[in-house]
């Protein structure tokens, strides 16, 4: 049943004017048909993210006309049927990309994507949604590519740019997993010597953990700070609940805010964030292996290979003739003694063990199973450290280029919606060099990605020219767009 039953008293929905510029459709057939072209042309152009071609528009108008010309049917009912067809079209569901005309059709080349495709790439990268009217107007005039810097600045100032922070950071640093991660709070606290602090790992605390990491990245992006502050900095973001979790006093209220950290604080930088410490742990204890692998993979871009299938779990190596519960460091030493394990674990373990003062909930602790924690170690590259403070300093000072390369590869992958291959190596090198010249500023990374050949050009080489009617005769690249 669909009401109201009496069409004379049909009430327009609140968003009626967004689709129909007139209060009532024209009564004459020719004028109604032209009005249908106007309504559907505007909607299809927006949905397809480029001008709709005449052939497609005629089909949509005919589809609508077949409904609203029937007795007892309203004009809006016919338009609604055509709108459904637009939303079911591959041109809406997928990103359809055309190329700019090729200067020498006989020579294989990687042509630039046209300006409409560039507008979509830019918008989905920064906003995770379709281009707005300004981007579309610039693309229509062929002026977007030469105004990229100003448009990126405008888009970064828009509230929709928060999507880049949440989606990219959520995937890159795995903080999207925080709210669903399972952990046995009692068991974790018991390993720390029976902490009397009551911990309620509820949705509010988990959300604060995630927001701490997002807000650090967001501040670096907004104020064009150095990306190295992700590794170590003298501030963080907390509310009362997260501050209490960290043992930080003097913070009240539910709102997250920036606070300065003491000089000797182990906090500061993503390696001390509860969000990351939580998702790189096991449900009942810390995991130096997961934490070390996280640093190698996500921060340094040098992941260790997966372990052989026949290697036993760490818990199976437990046992002590004195009845004492071994520490995680001792268990790791036993595990590392196996020839098949030593090569990879010698890379991962020192970094992971440097974070052992943080339990599986991201809380600071001095002891594990009644024994003082030893967080010292030596990296495979030769640098020695005493604790997590030293490790963060070493990563920031000695491995900045590795970090620049890693974050460049991650962001370029996010921007393109695909994995990188050998064709992209030169572009990554150029962005890393730019970051080095500009002291790791966020703008160097963002503009470097947007101005890079992989972002600006088609992946497949072609010798074909592109028709002026891109949706009818062009050679098209249809790419499934999944929000990053």
Predicted regions and their residues:
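Extended acidic/polar, glycine-enriched regions
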Residues: 1-25
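A conserved hydrophobic secondary-structure block that centers on an alpha-helix together
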Residues: 21-82, 90
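Short coil/turn segments at secondary-structure boundaries
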Residues: 11-15, 52-58, 76-80, 94-100, ...
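A cross-family structural signal marking well-folded subdomains
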Residues: 140, 146-294, 304-305, 482
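Short alpha-helical scaffolding segments that buttress acidic/His motifs in well-ordered protein cores
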Residues: 39-47, 60-64, 79-87, 119-123, ...
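Extended, well-ordered alpha-helical scaffold/bundle regions in very large, multi-domain proteins
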Residues: 55, 72-76, 95, 105-119, ...
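Short, basic, low-complexity termini and linkers enriched in Ser/Thr/Gly/Pro
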Residues: 471-480
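Sequence context surrounding c-type heme c attachment/ligation sites in exported
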Residues: 67, 243, 258-402, 415, ...
């Amino acid at each position: 049943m669909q009401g109201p039953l009496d069409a004379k008293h049909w009430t327009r929905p609140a968003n009626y004017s967004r689709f129909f510029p007139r209060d009532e459709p024209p009564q004459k057939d020719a004028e109604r048909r032209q009005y249908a072209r106007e309504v559907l042309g505007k909607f299809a152009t927006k949905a397809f993210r480029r001008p709709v071609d005449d052939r497609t528009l005629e089909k949509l108008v005919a589809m609508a006309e077949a409904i609203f010309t029937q007795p007892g049917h309203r004009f809006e009912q016919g338009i609604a049927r055509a709108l459904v067809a637009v939303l079911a079209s591959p041109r809406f569901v997928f990103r359809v990309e055309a190329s700019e005309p090729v200067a020498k059709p006989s020579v294989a080349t990687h042509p630039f994507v046209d300006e409409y495709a560039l507008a979509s790439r830019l918008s989905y990268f920064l906003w995770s949604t379709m281009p707005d009217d300004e981007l579309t107007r610039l693309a229509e005039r062929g002026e977007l590519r030469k105004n990229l810097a100003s448009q990126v600045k405008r888009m970064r100032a828009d509230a929709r740019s928060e999507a880049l922070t949440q989606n990219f950071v959520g995937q890159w640093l795995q903080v999207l997993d925080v709210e669903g991660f399972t952990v046995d709070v009692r068991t974790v606290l018991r390993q720390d010597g029976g902490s009397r602090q009551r911990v309620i790992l509820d949705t509010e605390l988990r959300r604060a953990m995630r927001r701490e990491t997002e807000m650090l990245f967001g501040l670096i992006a907004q104020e064009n700070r150095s990306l190295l502050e992700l590794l170590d900095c003298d501030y963080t973001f907390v509310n009362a609940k997260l501050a209490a979790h960290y043992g930080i006093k003097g913070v009240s209220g539910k709102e997250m805010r920036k606070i300065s950290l003491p000089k000797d604080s182990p906090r500061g930088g993503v390696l001390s964030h509860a969000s990351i410490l939580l998702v790189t742990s096991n449900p009942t204890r810390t995991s130096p292996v997961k934490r070390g692998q996280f640093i190698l993979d996500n921060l340094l871009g040098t992941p260790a290979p997966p372990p052989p299938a026949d290697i036993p779990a760490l818990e199976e190596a437990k046992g002590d003739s004195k009845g004492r519960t071994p520490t995680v460091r001792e268990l790791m030493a036993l595990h590392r003694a196996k020839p098949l394990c030593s090569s990879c674990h010698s890379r991962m373990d020192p970094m992971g063990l440097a974070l052992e003062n943080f339990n599986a909930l991201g809380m600071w602790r001095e002891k594990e199973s009644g024994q003082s924690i030893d967080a010292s170690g030596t990296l495979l590259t030769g640098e020695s450290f005493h604790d997590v403070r030293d490790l963060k300093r070493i990563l920031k000072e000695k491995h900045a280029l590795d970090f620049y390369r890693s974050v460049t590869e991650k962001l370029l992958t996010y921007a393109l919606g695909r994995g990188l291959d050998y064709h992209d190596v030169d572009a990554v090198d150029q962005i890393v060099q730019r970051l080095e010249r500009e002291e790791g500023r966020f703008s160097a990374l963002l503009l470097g990605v947007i101005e890079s050949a992989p972002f600006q050009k088609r992946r497949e080489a072609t010798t074909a020219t592109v028709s002026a009617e891109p949706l009818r005769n062009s050679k098209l690249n249809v790419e499934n767009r999944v929000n990053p």
